Amino acid sequence: MKKRNLVLSVMATCLVSCFLLSGCNGQKQIDSETVKTVKVEEQAHLQDDTVSPACKITIDYSYLAESDAADSIAQRINRTIQAHVLGKEYIRMNPEVAVDSFKNTYINNYRKDVNEFYQEDIKNGTPKDELPTWYNYEYGLTTHFSEGKEGILNFIAETFEYTGGAHPNSWNKWMNFEKNTGKLLALKDVFMAGSEKPMSDMLLEELITEMATRLEDSSITSLEGLQNAGILNSTNMYVPDNFLLEKEKVSFLYNKYDIAPYAVGVITLSLPYKI
């Protein structure tokens, strides 16, 4: 408990010094009221018809409206998000143009990947009801902003994709921005040097509790119990880059396969700023 108190004290002290003071410097700040959205729902078939295999794309993409050409904070945040979520090639585009370009590129790549195989099957007389299911792709992206700890704007992106295989894949991306600068915060910007090991130990404790409850397995009381359940077999516990500075706590996200098998799903662990 002493170690837990110490680490949380370090976290709280660092967070106060990094953010609470920076929010009082009188600079213009971004807030979530400036959020706009781009929505896309499209089904693109391999052929110019309505019966050939198709790629279904659904996008609900949030971005910050720039008040004027000099609104560098909103622009910096938008460009950072576009680079991380859509790809670096979209970084200089207007958000609406970036989403549309991303959609078109995805559809073009789908047709390149699948059309040759589809044409071969049609040429060979394969009945349409016997065509491989993986000829149908699906892509979904949902994003949103939320208010985080004082001076911080949180951003969450949730992606779903099916391109064949035993199951679809999904992953999340969490980001934290300083409202008064638009800077994307990394772990090193938030937590003091030397805190990774004790924080990893604390997260391990939280993981044991979470997995024992989720899997309804009372034998999970230690690292060994986790490993017997297929968790942390290929990596040590670590502090992930996917974290969220929320109002009352800091949360950490482990996507599927990060520390556990696909079947376990996404794992979220939280530590309070104060106890």
Roles of regions detected by a PLM:
Residues 1-34:
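Bacterial Sec-dependent N-terminal signal peptides
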Residues 24-275:
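Compositionally biased intrinsically disordered regions enriched in Thr/Gly
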